[in-house]
């Protein structure tokens, strides 16, 4: 169990507070899907962002929602029409087919509404735990973790833990631990999650992490403390 590997006496509050403070100063607060209150807009972003970059997605995301502001509108579109919009992202046939199926399922099963329930969301085509968490956190006001490889890297380094799963994002213990870190307040939960993701991309990078810029290095991060002792 991941929780058995966590050092005793760790103050999660310091971690949360440091990440939120960092996000308020350095985070990407203007990304449109982070400000979206519409579950459909958040779900679209989650699917468009797969295997591509934020920079590539922003303009396409805005145009996509302008044309298809609801699942019902997208369900009426053809795969070819959808492909024409998202072609610059690559894998356009796969993405378009998936988005079409998703919209049809939402119309058929949920009357065109996006459910604020994890199991219901995960029953939809192309929606896994991460996409479900994005909708629940950003649009439904639920304090869920956005546990992707970036958050996993930060958590494993800071707390000195390591998932035993070959695919850590499927590790239930890791999900439960990540969930315990998220503030209960919905707005703070967003700042914390977005902060961890931006922090992972800008500071706690996969290669050559910028520990000199890390507010967690000296008094929280196990990875840094071990490296300094070498």
UniProtKB/Swiss-Prot annotation:
Binds 1 [4Fe-4S] cluster. The cluster has a structural role. InterPro entries: DNA_glycosylase (IPR011257), Endonuclease3_FeS-loop_motif (IPR003651), HhH-GPD_domain (IPR003265), HhH_base_excis_C (IPR023170), MIG/MutY (IPR044298). Its EC number is 3.2.2.-, 3.2.2.29. [4Fe-4S] cluster binds at residues 204, 211, 214, 221. It holds the Pfam family HhH-GPD. Keywords: DNA damage, DNA repair, Glycosidase, Hydrolase, Iron, Iron-sulfur, Metal-binding. GO terms for biological process: base-excision repair. One of its GO terms (molecular function) is 4 iron, 4 sulfur cluster binding. Its cofactor is [4Fe-4S] cluster. It catalyses: Hydrolyzes mismatched double-stranded DNA and polynucleotides, releasing free thymine. It is an enzyme of class 3 (hydrolase). DNA glycosylase that excises thymine from T/G mismatches and uracil from U/G mismatches. Can also process T/GO and U/GO, but not A/G, T/C and U/C. Has weak AP lyase activity. PANTHER family: ADENINE DNA GLYCOSYLASE (PTHR42944:SF1). Belongs to the Nth/MutY family. This is Thymine/uracil-DNA glycosylase. It comes from Pyrobaculum aerophilum (strain ATCC 51768 / DSM 7523 / JCM 9630 / CIP 104966 / NBRC 100827 / IM2).
């Amino acid at each position: 169990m991941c929780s058995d590997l966590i050092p005793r006496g760790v103050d999660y509050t310091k971690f949360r507070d440091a990440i939120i403070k960092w996000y308020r100063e350095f985070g990407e607060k203007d990304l449109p899907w982070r400000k979206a209150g519409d579950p459909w807009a958040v779900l679209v972003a989650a699917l468009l962002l797969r295997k591509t970059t934020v920079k590539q997605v922003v303009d396409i995301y805005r145009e996509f929602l302008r044309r298809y502001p609801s699942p019902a509108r997208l369900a009426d579109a053809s795969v070819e029409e959808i492909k024409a919009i998202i072609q610059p992202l690559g894998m356009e046939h796969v993405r378009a087919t998936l988005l079409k199926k998703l919209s049809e399922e939402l119309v058929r099963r949920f009357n065109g509404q996006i459910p604020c329930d994890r199991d219901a969301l995960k029953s939809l085509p192309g929606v896994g735990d991460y996409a479900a968490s994005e909708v629940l956190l950003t649009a439904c006001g639920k304090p869920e973790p956005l546990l992707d490889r970036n958050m996993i890297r930060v958590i494993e380094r800071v707390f000195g833990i390591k998932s035993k799963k070959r695919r850590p994002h499927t590790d239930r213990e890791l999900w439960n631990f990540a969930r315990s870190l998220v503030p209960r307040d919905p707005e703070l939960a967003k700042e914390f999650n977005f902060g961890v993701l931006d922090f992972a991309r800008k500071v706690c990078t996969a290669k050559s992490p910028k520990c000199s810029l890390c507010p967690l290095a000296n008094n929280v991060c196990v990875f840094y403390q071990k490296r300094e002792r070498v």
